[in-house]
Amino acid sequence: MKRFWLFILPLLALPASSCISVGLDAVSGSTLIWNSGSNNYFNREAYTTLSGPKKLWIDGEVEQPTEVKLSKFPLRTVTVKEATYCKEGDSIAFLGAYRYEGYALCDILSGLKVDKASKEDLWPPIDLYIEIRNQAGDKAVFSWGEIFYSANMYGIVIAKRVTRVIPGKTGELWDLPTEMKLISTTDQISVRNIPSPTHISVHSLRGNYVVNRAPEVLENDPGRLAVQTSFKDTAAVLTELPKDLPVVTYPVLFYGNSTGYKGIREFSGQMLSRVIAPWFPSNDYHTVQTGMLSIAGVDGFRAAFSVSEIVNRNDHKEILLRQDGVSFSIYTACDAFADRSIKGLSEIRLIQTEP
């Protein structure tokens, strides 16, 4: 028996020798460094810790403004390819590919007690959005839906540490950031990745919404969808889908946050990003970074959508604009839940966020 254990113990140790450990993370394994023989291409160097704020101030439509300590939340791992707009050359510059570990907005805001202004006429929180700022005055906006309804629930983080995703053949070492930063993993161009965020404000959509959920309101939908660049400025009124855009079809397991499984459905429509491109182009980077849209139905039901989550996606989970008869609706392929798939659309409006 003694001889058996002398033989088997060295074999048990073999798997551990294929990678180098730097403070093992038993949950994600994200602190492992890649070594020859490992199949994980995201861990080819040790992480670098980023300096930055240790706390966040949260206010707005909340029961009590509060300061939260970031270190109380778990670190979530995300990978992202970052690119930014260069004003000088009117071009896109690739910054690099990185693995970040940071504090997810989903975790930070999960325990927050919201007191939204619209609670009397719209119970779901889908009309909420947040503004994130730093001490330099930079701002980025996110809808409540892309934080809490998204199928990628930990995809927006305040990064605390970083490693490069190093190309195996070229060995290119991208420049590392030096300070903590906001990371949105589904953004094609990284305009919302502002450095060292310190402040979050919670808001709800404002507008002349008339809430009437009676079935006949949707049945008598006139089929007129206003595209508005402000509360007073209507850029277009759609009565049909564009003729020159392709139709996309998604077969889905439809699931509501409140009512659960709704069956297997198939949704066909046009990419909303392309339909609204004449008024909200993806290369209007200031609006992509700070713009929030109200998408509302004739019955007053509405949801907030950041401009970025519609026109600046990199995950190909497009929001579809559909038309059934004369009535417009959207399907949100990016969401785990059906709640923001609004029917009987009457407006897509750019709202005025805080300066």
Give residue spans per PLM region.
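Bacterial N-terminal signal peptides
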Residues: 8-15
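Positively charged n-region of N-terminal signal peptides that target proteins for export
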Residues: 1-4
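N-terminal intrinsically disordered, low-complexity segments enriched in P/E/S/T
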Residues: 20-355
